[in-house]
């Protein structure tokens, strides 16, 4: 067990990616993966898994503020199930409420509107999802 985790912020056009270490509780963004109507380039995901060899994958679970599911929730679950089915790695779903808002705010502080490109926001969201997972003691 390396203690390495990959996190994905699922989206229909772009999937944010972050890598983190359980021992330090830290995460950093990786380049986002383009998706077509929620379907990623599976060869890119396979490459990420081979390169980083994570012990676990965290997929952000989009929920409404009251905790109820939204249309994207089922698609994120399906994405998580497909990762597990294709690659046999442990996949955990983690509440991602407000991660995009927090990511946008942090990126804006760093570089204004120019820093808010879609891929950067999605991968920054994946970092926040993974850090939140660590903070909850996982």
Curated annotation (Swiss-Prot):
Subcellular location: Cytoplasm
Entry-linked InterPro entries: RNaseH-like_sf, YqgF, YqgF/RNaseH-like_dom, YqgF/RNaseH-like_dom_sf
Annotated CDD domains: YqgF
GO cellular component, one term: cytosol
GO MF, any single term: nuclease activity
UniProt key word Cytoplasm: yes
Pfam families in the cross-refs: RuvX
An individual GO BP term: rRNA 5'-end processing
Enzyme Commission number(s) of this protein: 3.1.-.-
Keywords: Cytoplasm, Hydrolase, Nuclease, Ribosome biogenesis
Family membership noted in the UniProt record: Belongs to the YqgF nuclease family.
Function: Could be a nuclease involved in processing of the 5'-end of pre-16S rRNA.
Designated name of the protein: Putative pre-16S rRNA nuclease
Gene encoding the protein: yqgF
């Amino acid at each position: 067990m390396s203690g390495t985790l990959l996190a994905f912020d699922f989206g229909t056009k772009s999937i944010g990616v972050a890598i983190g270490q359980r021992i330090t509780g830290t995460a950093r963004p990786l380049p986002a993966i383009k998706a077509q109507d929620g379907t990623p380039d599976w060869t890119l995901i396979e490459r990420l898994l081979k390169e980083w060899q994570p012990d676990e994958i965290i997929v952000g679970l989009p929920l409404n503020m009251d905790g109820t599911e939204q249309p994207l929730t089922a698609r994120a679950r399906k994405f998580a199930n497909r990762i597990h089915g294709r690659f046999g790695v442990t996949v955990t779903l983690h509440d991602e409420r407000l991660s995009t808002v927090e990511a946008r705010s942090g990126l804006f502080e760093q570089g204004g509107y120019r820093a808010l490109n879609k891929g950067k926001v999605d991968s920054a969201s994946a970092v926040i999802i993974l850090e939140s997972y660590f903070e909850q003691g996982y």
